[in-house]
A protein has these predicted regions:
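Short, conserved clusters of charged catalytic residues that mark active-site
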Residues: 11, 72, 103
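A solvent-exposed, acidic/Ser-Thr-rich amphipathic alpha-helical stretch
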Residues: 25-90
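Short, low-complexity N-terminal intrinsically disordered segments enriched in polar/charged residues
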Residues: 1-34
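Short beta-strand edge/turn micro-motifs at domain boundaries
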Residues: 85, 101-132
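Short beta-strand segments enriched in hydrophobic/aromatic residues
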Residues: 20, 32-33, 90-92, 121-124
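Extended, polar beta-sheet/loop recognition surfaces of beta-rich domains
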Residues: 131-141
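Short, cysteine-centered beta-strand-loop-beta hairpins and adjacent loop/turn segments enriched
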Residues: 92-99
Length: 141
């Protein structure tokens, strides 16, 4: 596991918030592999087109119009050859308050042009075991 790999993956995660908060669905989708997917609150978006559509959709655009900030916590990254996993917490702020606090488990694949997100699972940290398990899985990796 090289420091360069960890930095590149951390940068991908860090790029998510600014891209999604500016409504740039194409930039969000470009973080993912062509066949990458994102599962948030039980909704699964498969492929770049669906991920971009989520950001461009009315629900997300409404959040942006009211004021929103997606803040990614520092990830714990484990690289194994051309794949990697990371876990982190994220906080979504709405104008004046915390709206959601979540656990994230990301997988990554190394491509000819660099690292891309293969998958992201996001679950609310609301006391449910499923969210805690996302964070716990990485320690066993």
């Amino acid at each position: 596991m090289s420091t360069d790999d960890v930095v590149a993956i951390t940068q991908l995660i860090a790029a998510y918030g600014p891209a999604v908060d500016t409504g740039d669905g194409d930039a969000v989708a470009a973080l993912f592999a062509e066949d990458g997917w994102y599962d948030v609150a039980g909704m699964r978006f498969e492929g770049r087109a669906q991920i971009a559509a989520m950001v461009h959709g009315g629900g997300h655009q409404g959040l942006i119009a009211e004021g929103v900030a997606h803040v990614m916590g520092l990830p714990h990254v484990v690289v194994s050859g051309d794949t990697a996993t990371a876990v982190n917490q994220s906080v979504v702020f709405r104008k004046t308050h915390v709206w959601r606090v979540a656990a994230n488990r990301w997988t990554f694949t190394r491509t000819a042009t660099g690292w891309l997100v293969q998958s992201r699972v996001n679950r609310l940290l609301d006391g449910a075991q499923e969210a805690r398990d996302l964070l716990r899985q990485e320690r066993r990796a």
